A protein has these predicted regions:
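Non-catalytic pre-domain segments flanking phosphatase-related domains
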Residues: 1-32, 40-53, 204-207, 213, ...
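A generic local structural motif
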Residues: 14-16, 64-66, 132
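Short interface patches used for recognition in eukaryotic signaling and trafficking proteins
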Residues: 17-21, 45-58, 71-77, 110-119, ...
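A structural signal for short, well-ordered beta-strand segments and their strand-loop junctions
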Residues: 29, 78-81, 146, 171-173
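Acidic di-acidic motifs
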Residues: 31-33, 148-149
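Short, acidic loop-to-helix structural element flanking the phosphoryl-transfer center
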Residues: 52-79, 85-90, 124
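C-terminal cap/substrate-recognition subdomain and adjoining C-terminal extension
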Residues: 73, 86-232
């Protein structure tokens, strides 16, 4: 575990100040399943969703929409997923109630759609996609933010950080197989803290979850505030 933050960087309260828009901008690469969409929760359900769960998922959709719009204020957003593009589009509408993903000018890159028919091993999909995206945008961006729930994918991004030091690359590790409230809390937390992450060249972990008196009230922290894995 790396060093703790100095007091002025402690994330005990939301930061509302927006970062200055950079000339070359910021690119967000955000996973879909269990990062924006509560995929594990709905696929592991053996019974139909209750009305409360449906309403929670719609609430998640509203928060995801706000988060994506917030990210778009700072740069370009790409949903980078191993699922199909049709899955992203259908679940965004049918579950989250988000009908304007494309209208938001958010690009969806499906590694499954791009590489499966080419016979490329799945373990290389994200790495190949990342290289292609970087080659396209490297002269247009200053900051790259990668958000994902997969430790394997986060490790791919970390390797990429070491090879490409001309760009500020930060990763955000979401919890694996979150329930709906967990995902809502994670994304709401990022909405108010994303400005701190941009341009930091660090790896952030949303790991620790402590349950409060209200069973629906969770308090999230970045692992030991910040887990500084990357270093020069």
């Amino acid at each position: 575990m790396g060093p703790t933050l100095s007091s002025e960087h402690h994330l005990s309260k939301p930061y509302e100040d927006k970062p200055k828009r950079l000339d070359k901008g910021t690119l967000f690469l955000i996973d879909w399943d269990d990062t924006l969409m509560c995929t594990s929760f709905i696929t592991l359900k053996t019974q139909p969703l209750t009305e409360k769960e449906q309403n929670l998922i719609l609430n998640l959709g509203n928060i995801v929409s706000v988060f994506l719009s917030h990210c778009l204020e700072y740069g370009k957003v790409i949903i980078l997923t191993n699922s199909s593009e049709n899955w992203v589009k259908s679940t965004s509408v049918d579950y989250l109630g988000i009908t304007d993903l494309i209208d938001k000018n958010i690009k969806i890159i499906s590694t499954r759609d791009n590489y499966l028919k080419k016979g490329i091993d799945k373990k290389y999909w994200k790495e190949l996609a990342l290289e292609e995206i970087f080659n396209k945008y490297q002269n247009k961006i200053e900051n790259l933010i990668c958000a994902n729930d997969s430790e394997k994918d986060i490790n791919i991004f970390k390797k990429f950080m070491c090879k490409n030091k001309g760009i500020n690359i930060s990763t955000i590790k979401f919890k694996r197989k979150p329930n709906i409230m967990t995902l809502i809390k994670e994304i709401k937390y990022l909405i108010t803290h994303i400005n701190i992450i941009i341009g930091t060249n660090k790896n952030y972990y949303l790991l620790k979850e402590t349950k409060e008196k209200n069973e629906d009230d969770f308090n999230f922290h970045f692992g030991n505030l910040f887990d500084y894995i990357f270093s020069d």
